[in-house]
Amino acid sequence: MKPLSSAIAAALILFSAQGVAEQTTQPVVTSCANVVVVPPSQEHPPFDLNHMGTGSDKSDALGVPYYNQHAM
């Protein structure tokens, strides 16, 4: 009988601790009234941190180097 009561007490403590962990101190407010979800473009990665990467230079899109556009 004693091992059964110990197991029940351990299960009670475990489940009550899990219930306390799931509670939040602030109420969760979600408003989805004016939300527009736009999928990312497949042409460019979302975070292109490499400024020397392919396709990130405007001269690639124009077909000529940008520094040759200005007359010296």
Swiss-Prot record:
GO terms for biological process: response to antibiotic. InterPro entries: MarB. The keyword Nucleotidyltransferase does not apply. Keywords: Antibiotic resistance. GO terms for cellular component: outer membrane-bounded periplasmic space. NCBIfam families: PRK10106.1. This is Multiple antibiotic resistance protein MarB.
